[in-house]
A protein has these predicted regions:
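Nucleotidyltransferase catalytic core that binds NTPs
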Residues: 1-182
Length: 182
């Protein structure tokens, strides 16, 4: 059996991640999908507003609503790209990486790790920083229906529900004073 691995920070889990995971489940067939959450030790900061546990809960909300099962692991940062694949593999194991990120593809391929590359349509609107900036703009909007209306273009409904039910959007208003790209 071969595991299919999807790696990301999931800050937050958005429609690009959902598309990538759906493709990973297609590739995997009866095999296992492993979701590897990077920057596991980060949380409560502008580029990484949610903790590992919160990101797991977002992903589990999406998985449950789609009747999918996956293993979720966290990976701490080491800030050492040449050694990243070896480090990450200790957490996500061997298998096939499914990615839409060219840099990640090249990093894993340079370490002879099998990769399935997925072209992501509408990538410019589904970058994590854009989704976080939208959430920042909504962080002081208290009309849940308005928040849902705006976010449905980029975030799956179960994740929107989780963010609202857990009051996990407001914190962005306390973290930054302006646009933070990246």
């Amino acid at each position: 059996m071969v595991d299919y691995i999807v790696l990301g920070r999931f800050q937050p889990f958005h429609n690009g991640h959902a598309y990538l995971l759906n493709r990973a489940f297609e590739f995997a067939g009866e095999n296992e999908v492993v979701i590897a959450i990077g920057s596991a030790g980060k949380g409560w900061e502008s580029n990484n507003p949610w903790t590992l546990e919160e990101r797991k809960l977002m992903i589990e909300a999406w998985l449950g609503s789609n009747k999918k099962i996956a293993t979720i692991v966290g990976i701490d940062d080491i800030n050492d790209p040449p050694n990243w694949v070896k480090h990450a593999s200790k957490h996500h194991g061997d298998g096939v990486l499914v990615t839409s990120d060219e840099g990640t593809k090249e990093l894993y391929e340079s370490d002879n790790f099998p990769v399935e590359f997925v072209d992501l349509a509408n990538r410019e609107n589904l970058e994590g920083w854009r989704v976080r900036q939208t959430l920042l703009m909504l962080s002081t909007v208290y009309d849940d229906n308005a928040v849902r209306e705006v976010l449905t273009a980029t975030v799956p409904i179960p994740v929107i529900d989780w963010l609202i039910e857990n009051d996990a959007i407001f914190r962005l208003s306390t973290m930054v004073a302006g646009v933070n790209v990246g």
